[in-house]
């Protein structure tokens, strides 16, 4: 007979999708924002009233909140979970709508995209995908299930709302933590005259860095469909182009959470273009890569989340999360002479790569 711990582990692995759905429910109801508007802490009756939850459903709301507290989405006071106070914690604070703290935009779109029906259907298609042989480029699981690719026009044709959520959620996710990078990596941009921000959407990252480093001339490079929707702000320059063939020349090029979406071959093409766009190391030239660096040495919890993010890449993109050895191989193949990991910030690493 299996141990009670084995059974509990089985429950967790089999049913943990309910935690994701509970998180989605909390975002759809606006629970983080409601608690924020109530001063950051709320009783169950006050929360139910703020959300206009019928009295008949209040006990069920308490059970949902209990599950979300135990999973770390919210915090509680010393009072009992079902009848006490619920508080925002660092996770739920980044799910508050309409509040920007240290350039941390709300992550609600990221949650809603990641728990959407199309994402769930793609994940359910993994077993069938593994059984199918493929000639030529192997399609992603998402492509196999939906006959559409994320980040291009086919997703908009599949579901315009999903396409908007993915675009907004990716931008919010990728800009998360930029305040920390600016504070802790002041020397990263020190002495730079110009920088091309590669595939950075609406330029949020560049504008944030410009406030701390006004001497740097920023150019945001992205696809025409992205740049065309971005209003000129007079702070950074915007350049619409083919990401695989056009990188505006600058002293540095920054790739923030770009390469993990891409195959080895596409990474090679982009890195080669970036290398050609910068001057030598002696002239201050460098490529700044901010991306996940998979490492068991980060500890079991962080390593587990990195491997989870790698499965996300497997299902939805042609990319992967890479170890330092993988990054070294890529940089060498693209013709760079050297690199250094400046620092690791949780799952992410900040890497300088030299021509």
Curated annotation (Swiss-Prot):
Induction notes from the record: Induced by cold and photosystem II excitation pressure by high light illumination.
Question: In which residues is S-adenosyl-L-homocysteine bound?
Answer: 222, 242, 256
Enzyme class, spelled out:
transferase
Database matches in PROSITE patterns: SAM_OMT_II (PS51683)
Q: Which reaction does it catalyse?
A: 7,8-dihydroxycoumarin + S-adenosyl-L-methionine = 7-hydroxy-8-methoxycoumarin + S-adenosyl-L-homocysteine + H(+)
For this protein, what is the EC number? 2.1.1.-
One Gene Ontology term from the biological process aspect of the record = response to cold
Swiss-Prot/TrEMBL keywords: Methyltransferase, S-adenosyl-L-methionine, Transferase
Protein's name in the database = Daphnetin O-methyltransferase 1
Q: Which organism is it from?
A: Secale cereale (Rye)
Source organism phylogeny: Eukaryota, Viridiplantae, Streptophyta, Embryophyta, Tracheophyta
